[in-house]
């Protein structure tokens, strides 16, 4: 029997639920539900027969491909470490040391950290500012077009949308 979640086959997770073996590896909860961890009965590390997040070939690859179709991206990746790890990975994947990157002044500190670690040349631009409430709101397409025209050699542009205050920017990707 194979479960499906959004069209993705989950045969391996079904097999894990039926497995009557005690695991002597991480994670430490040993697939037990005693700790109230949702999904612990199928939580397993990269062992033979399981997929590997860093070299996906099975369920993880299927999920990444499905995400690519949903978001109409060339490639999608699952990640760990939260958004900070994802931001670092994305910037390192696109930019080499010394490259130019354009970032909005309201970006998360992990963007600044990534730029420092990668030794990037940073060009800043300012999203619209709400003087009444005292924070940056959204970025306009005209602002993006202008900063890109002035920095055609930039490898990437980082825009926070939605912002921490919930404002969104309607920016057309020029890929």
PLM features: residue spans?
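N-terminal "arm"/small-domain region of PLP-dependent enzymes with the aminotransferase-like
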Residues: 4-58
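Conserved N-terminal alpha-helix of the aminotransferase class I/II PLP-enzyme fold
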Residues: 39-85, 106
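Conserved beta-loop-alpha segment that forms the PLP phosphate-binding cup at the N-terminus of a helix
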Residues: 74-98, 114
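Short hydrophobic alpha-helical runs that function as membrane-insertion/retention elements
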Residues: 77-78, 102, 122-126
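Substrate-binding/gating loop at the entrance of the active-site cleft, primarily
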Residues: 103-122
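Short, acidic/turn-prone active-site loops that include or flank metal/cofactor-
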Residues: 106-109, 126-132
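Active-site phosphate-binding strand-loop segment of PLP-dependent enzymes
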Residues: 133-175
């Amino acid at each position: 029997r194979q479960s499906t979640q959004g069209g993705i086959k989950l045969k391996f997770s079904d097999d894990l639920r039926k497995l009557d073996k005690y695991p002597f590896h991480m994670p430490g909860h040993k697939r037990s539900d005693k700790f109230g961890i949702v999904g612990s009965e199928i939580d397993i590390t990269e062992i033979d027969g399981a997929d590997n997040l860093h070299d996906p070939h099975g369920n993880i690859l299927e999920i990444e491909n499905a995400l690519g179709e949903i978001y109409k991206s060339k490639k999608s990746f699952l990640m760990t470490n939260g958004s900070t790890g994802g931001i670092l990975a994305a910037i390192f994947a696109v930019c080499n040391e010394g490259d130019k990157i354009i970032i909005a002044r309201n970006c998360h500190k992990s963007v600044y950290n990534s730029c420092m670690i990668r030794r990037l040349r940073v060009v800043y631009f300012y999203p619209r500012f709400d003087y009444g409430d005292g924070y940056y709101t959204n970025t306009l397409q005209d602002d993006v077009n202008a900063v890109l025209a002035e920095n055609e050699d930039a490898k990437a542009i980082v825009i926070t949308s939605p912002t921490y205050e919930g404002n969104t920017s309607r920016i057309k990707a020029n890929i």
